[in-house]
Every structure is written in structure tokens, then in C-alpha cells.
A protein has these predicted regions:
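A short, Lys/Arg-rich alpha-helix, primarily the initiator
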Residues: 1-20
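Short C-terminal boundary/hinge segments that cap the last helix of small helical domains
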Residues: 54-67
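Short, basic-rich loop-to-helix N-cap that marks the start of a DNA-contacting helix
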Residues: 39-51
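Recognition helix of helix-turn-helix/homeodomain-like DNA-binding domains
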Residues: 26-41
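Alpha-helical residues within the helix-turn-helix
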Residues: 12, 23, 51
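Residues in the helix-turn-helix
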Residues: 20, 31, 59
Length: 67
């Protein structure tokens, strides 16, 4: 299972809000919802997030085993 929990933690730690992601990073509100609900997000969007914040993919996404 894919989880964006690492990025949600990063957002809290760095005081990043929804409006910043939409307006400064350029992601859509639909993508923001997907990130919060651990739904699939396109790889080019994940790359955009990594490049904007200068963070490795491991700070955006993690894979958890399904139980």
C-alpha cells in the first residue's frame, strides 16, 4: 500500500499548507486530496514536489505491506 504519510509529516514540520501546494508548487486540489487519502498520484507530480522542496522521494512516499 502506498502512503504519503512522510510528506504529510514534512508539511506539518515545515508549516506548509494546502494553498502553498496549490499556488506555489502547482498541484491541483484533486492531487492534494489524493495525497491526504493515500490514493495514487502520478510520478511526474511526485517529482515536482521533490524538486520544489529539494527532498528525496523517501520524504514524500512510503510503501507499507497490506495486512
Amino acid at each position: 500500500m502506498i502512503s504519503y504519510k512522510p510528506f504529510r509529516h514534512y508539511m506539518v514540520e515545515h508549516d506548509i499548507d494546502r494553498d502553498y501546494l496549490l499556488n506555489e508548487v502547482g498541484i491541483s486540489s484533486t492531487t492534494f486530496t489524493k495525497l491526504n487519502q493515500d490514493k495514487p498520484v502520478r510520478m511526474d507530480i511526485l517529482e515536482k514536489i521533490c524538486l520544489h522542496f529539494k527532498i528525496p522521494i523517501e520524504q514524500v512516499i512510503e510503501i507499507k505491506e497490506n495486512h
